[in-house]
Amino acid sequence: MAKLYFYYAAMNAGKSTVLLQSSYNYRERGMQTLLFTPAIDTRFQYGTICSRIGLSEQAYAFNNSDNLYVLTQEFQLQTQKYSCVLIDEAQFLTREQVYQLTEITDQMSIPVLAYGLRTDFRGELFPGSQFLLAWADELIELKTICHCGRKAIMNMRIDENGQAVVEGEQVLIGGNESYVATCRLHYKRGEAEVTFPRNKLFNKDTNAF
């Protein structure tokens, strides 16, 4: 029996990487997958799901007015049967679109894997996440860590100086320059340690970085 899965996490937990790996696993076995990504996410090329480690794949960019159930039916008429539907940045789904995902699972018998944030920078649920938490068959937490080493469960919005931002619109598209994943303690303190990873080259002569 097909199920609706919600993979949730804080920022930078590798959600898109896991999504792309899941799609690859299906396609490696000759199965078709259908990928959706919200059009509102303008960080990368339009209609593309990108991971921080460099993986990418084309996807259908949807708007809040799109019916994902109808789109999946229409796309399936143009190709062979889909074995899985995957949704990136699922927190941006509307209540109606989450219901449409349940229809894809229940009426079309296609597994749906949705990946997204659980809460916004205020610690409040996104609409899409709220109804995925309520209606998904399986909930899977993808873990990442705070700068202190504890598990990060909060998404802190920061300004250009790395200071915590506590007011503003719920949706502000951004990456590491705008958000930091932290534990609850450092979120409440408004403390974010903003670091920029340095690429180290491996020296084959010394067998070390």
Curated annotation (Swiss-Prot):
One of its GO terms (biological process) is thymidine metabolic process. PROSITE patterns: TK_CELLULAR_TYPE. Pfam families: TK. Zn(2+) binds at C146, C148, C183, H186. It is an enzyme of class 2 (transferase). Keywords: ATP-binding, Cytoplasm, DNA synthesis, Kinase, Metal-binding, Nucleotide-binding, Transferase, Zinc. HAMAP family: Thymidine_kinase. This is Thymidine kinase. The gene is tdk.
